[in-house]
Amino acid sequence: MALTSQDIARVANLARLELRPEETEHTLSQLNGFFALVEQMAAVNTDGVEPLAHPAAVIGEVALRLRDDIASEPNQREASQVSAPAVERGLFLVPKVIE
């Protein structure tokens, strides 16, 4: 699979990116190199190769030793919000930064 400059321009347009011609060529080169590597890996014959062991498969039926989900500290939201300039229903109010 190989991309063209038109493919890069289309994807950039969909992503609302403005690429200079040299950026387009650089991106095209990088992506085509990536696709060439993927094609090389796909061409490798893996018949008879055992999959690597997965830790969960090695453990099998043994129960995982996880700690109980218990709150270790009390809720201090009110104390944290005392110095906040604006709070509403337990949430910090901040100025709008995106139009």
Swiss-Prot record:
NCBIfam families: gatC. One of its GO terms (biological process) is glutaminyl-tRNAGln biosynthesis via transamidation. This is Aspartyl/glutamyl-tRNA(Asn/Gln) amidotransferase subunit C. One of its GO terms (molecular function) is glutaminyl-tRNA synthase (glutamine-hydrolyzing) activity. Heterotrimer of A, B and C subunits. Keywords: ATP-binding, Ligase, Nucleotide-binding, Protein biosynthesis. The keyword Ligase applies.
